[in-house]
Amino acid sequence: KEPGFSVSIALVAKDGTPNIGVVFDPITDTLYHAAKGIGAFKNNNPWKIKPANEHLTYVTDRKLKDTPHAAEIESLLHQQVKKLGLKGITEMAGGGSVLNGIRVLENGPACMLKLPKKEDGGGSLWDFAATACIFQELGLPATNFAGRRLDLNRKDGTFMNQEGVFYAN
């Protein structure tokens, strides 16, 4: 058991819509799940998200300073801080894409983003399918970098690098 590790499973429709998403954090023994049209749950209780921080939490797998295009990302984050009237940015680095999606939900206002890139990587569709369903049921964005629905049933591969990823709370 390593912090940031999780187990997830999802059911995705042929059109790429996430219909069921389940995430388990073995470190905290916490279960998150959602089903399309039914809602989102944390440890089997209906889950309501209430962003309470005075800062924007940037959730990432590696520190911003070690990220390609760090200046571009930092600029985007500062724009959001200003737009939302927040006091600054707090970085939460480490962990896999699945739990980082959950961290966005639990540390709002928060975001996780992966810029589009040409080379493979940036997580695979199975890294995002379960949390995309949970976000969908909470009415929060889990989109590609252009703001469109994630393509979770790609025919040309599993990596999400071509469209990027954006999660927000």
Q: Residue spans of the language-model regions?
A:
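Short capping micro-motif at the N-terminus of alpha-helices
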Residues: 21, 34, 49-50, 152
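Short, flexible active-site-adjacent loop segments at beta-strand->alpha-helix junctions, enriched
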Residues: 37-38, 46, 64
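DPxDG-like acidic metal-binding loop motif
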Residues: 1-41
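An extended, acidic
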Residues: 50-169
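Short acidic, gly/pro-rich beta-turn/loop elements at beta-sheet edges
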Residues: 32, 44, 68-70
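Short hydrophobic/aromatic-rich beta-strand segments that constitute the beta-sheet cores
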Residues: 40-43, 60
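Residue-level detection of beta-strand-connecting loop/turn positions
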Residues: 43-44, 147
